[in-house]
C-alpha cells in the first residue's frame, strides 16, 4: 500500500535561501518529492521557464482562476498574485509523493485551514545584515526592491511561531541536513509506516 505523501509548507523572508534549499533537497530521490509549481502574475526573471519555475499568467487570468476555486491557496505579495493548484496538489499527494509549497505566511495560513496536517517549516537567516548581503548578491533586484524586501522581512519573520519547524540557514549544508531530517522524520511517523508497511505489520501480528 502506497503511503499518502506529506504536504510541506516552506516559508522564509526573501533571500533566506528557501528556494536554494528546496532545489538541493529535490536532487536526492526526486521521484518521491516535488515542489509545487505556482501560478503568478509577476514577470519572469532571467532564466525562469514557464511551467517549470512558475505558471506565468495575467492578472485577469489569475482572477478568473480564483472565481473557479482552482487554487489551494493564493495571496498577493509585493503587488503580484501567487496561487497553488488545488487539483494538482491533491493528486500528487494521493500518488504518495511529498509536495513542497514555497509560499509565504499568508498562503501558509490558508493551507492550514484546509489541511491542518500540513507540516510548516520556516527558514531564518542568521542576521538582517546577512539577509541584505544575500539579496544584494543575487543581482536580481534593484536597490529599491531590496529595500522593500528588507522592510517586509521583519513582518514575515514575526510569523515564525506559526510553523512546526524552524531552520537557521547560517551554513547551507547544515541547514540542508536539518531539512532532510525533517522530511525523513515525517515518513517515519506511525501513520506513514502503517500505510507503507501494513501487510508486513499484519503478518507480524498474526498468530
From Swiss-Prot:
Record-stated family: Belongs to the guanylate kinase family.
Natural source organism: Shewanella violacea (strain JCM 10179 / CIP 106290 / LMG 19151 / DSS12)
Domain Guanylate kinase-like: residue ranges: 5-184
InterPro entries tied to this protein: GK/Ca_channel_bsu, Guanylate_kin-like_dom, Guanylate_kinase, Guanylate_kinase_CS, P-loop_NTPase
Official protein name in the record: Guanylate kinase
UniProt entry keywords in alphabetical sequence: ATP-binding, Cytoplasm, Kinase, Nucleotide-binding, Transferase
Annotated PROSITE patterns: GUANYLATE_KINASE_1, GUANYLATE_KINASE_2
PANTHER family on file: GUANYLATE KINASE (PTHR23117:SF13), GUANYLATE KINASE-RELATED (PTHR23117)
Chemical reaction(s) catalysed: GMP + ATP = GDP + ADP
Described purpose of this protein according to its UniProt entry: Essential for recycling GMP and indirectly, cGMP.
SUPFAM superfamilies: P-loop containing nucleoside triphosphate hydrolases
GO MF annotation list: ATP binding; guanylate kinase activity
NCBIfam families, alphabetized: guanyl_kin
Amino acid at each position: 500500500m502506497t503511503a499518502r505523501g506529506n504536504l510541506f509548507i516552506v516559508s522564509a523572508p526573501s533571500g533566506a535561501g528557501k528556494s536554494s534549499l528546496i532545489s538541493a533537497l529535490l536532487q536526492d530521490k526526486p521521484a518521491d518529492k516535488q515542489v509545487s509549481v505556482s501560478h503568478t502574475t509577476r514577470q519572469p526573471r532571467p532564466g525562469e521557464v514557464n511551467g517549470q519555475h512558475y505558471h506565468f499568467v495575467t492578472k485577469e487570468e489569475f482572477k478568473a482562476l480564483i472565481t473557479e476555486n482552482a487554487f489551494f491557496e493564493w495571496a498577493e505579495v509585493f503587488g503580484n498574485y501567487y496561487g497553488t493548484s488545488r487539483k494538482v496538489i491533491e493528486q500528487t499527494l494521493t500518488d504518495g509523493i511529498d509536495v513542497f509549497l514555497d509560499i509565504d505566511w499568508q498562503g501558509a495560513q490558508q493551507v492550514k485551514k484546509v489541511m491542518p496536517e500540513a507540516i510548516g517549516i520556516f527558514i531564518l537567516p542568521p542576521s538582517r545584515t546577512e539577509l541584505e548581503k544575500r539579496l544584494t548578491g543575487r543581482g536580481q533586484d534593484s536597490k529599491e526592491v531590496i529595500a522593500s524586501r528588507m522592510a517586509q522581512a521583519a513582518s514575515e519573520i514575526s510569523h515564525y511561531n506559526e510553523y512546526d519547524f524552524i531552520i537557521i540557514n547560517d551554513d547551507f549544508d547544515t541547514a540542508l541536513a536539518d531539512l532532510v531530517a525533517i522530511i525523513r522524520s515525517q515518513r517515519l511517523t506511525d501513520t506513514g509506516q502503517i500505510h507503507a508497511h501494513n501487510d508486513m505489520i499484519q503478518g507480524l501480528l498474526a498468530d
